[in-house]
């Protein structure tokens, strides 16, 4: 009897333990179910469900709502429409000066693009006036050229020295450099007459009998290069070549 009662107590304890174990497992399952339910609720807002739901194409009947989630027809979105080529001109024509719809007057005073290609007709009166001006400009230059050539010729003719009419100074210079120092001084009759006829004013006769139009200075330089014949020696009685000296007769 005692053994049977002991066995019953052991079986009752086992049964109570088993019931507690089953209760604990059921409680764990319930807690796990609650956690999964809360996770699913979170995923509806932040998880995969929300991403999958919003990644699709938007519905056509969506409308913009205010804070009270009431649809307002004024807030309806207008779909984007492509540019209408009929109402909007091309950009090149829009920025061209001949564009039909320009409202500013930036290029108002400028000629159009087609007018720029036209030829400009010249005015015949203006052209003739320009030719006259060119001719008048050429005339002074030609006159200056003529004067320059004349001045150079004059300088070359007269040994690059100005023309002097004072023959007394030139005669003295010529006598000094020509070696005619042995001639008597002025105031002695025939010799002075001979000297004045030789160094007198133009025209003079050269050694060959030709009339020369040269300046006395040029004649002086020529005498230095080609010295003239010495003056004729005076004969007895003071007669020269013009008075019929025997030296002239020989």
Curated annotation (Swiss-Prot):
The modification Omega-N-methylarginine is found at residues 175, 181. Residues 1-150, 175-250 are annotated as: Disordered. Belongs to the myelin basic protein family. Homodimer. In the embryo, isoform 1-isoform 3 are found in neurons within the central nervous system (primarily in pioneer neurons important in the formation of the cortex) and the peripheral nervous system. They are also expressed in the thymus, gut, lung and kidney. In the adult, isoform 1-isoform 3 are highly expressed in the brain (mainly in brain regions rich in oligodendrocytes) and spleen. Lower levels are seen in the heart, kidney and lung. Isoform 2 is also found in cells of the immune system. Residues 197-206 have a biased composition (Polar residues). The record marks 221-222 as: Cleavage. It is linked to Defects in Mbp are a cause of dysmyelinating diseases such as the shiverer (SHI) and myelin deficient (MLD) diseases characterized by decreased myelination in the CNS, tremors, and convulsions of progressively increasing severity leading to early death. The shiverer mice only express isoform 2, the MLD mice have a reduced amount of Mbp. This is Myelin basic protein. GO terms for biological process: maintenance of blood-brain barrier; MAPK cascade; membrane organization; myelination; negative regulation of heterotypic cell-cell adhesion; positive regulation of chemokine (C-X-C motif) ligand 2 production; positive regulation of interleukin-6 production; response to toxic substance. Residues 1-28, 95-113 have a biased composition (Basic and acidic residues). It comes from Mus musculus. Pfam families: Myelin_MBP (PF01669). As in other animals, several charge isomers may be produced as a result of optional post-translational modifications, such as phosphorylation of serine or threonine residues, deamidation of glutamine or asparagine residues, citrullination and methylation of arginine residues. Methylated on arginine residues; decreases with the age of the animal, making MBP more cationic. The modification Deamidated glutamine is found at residue 234.
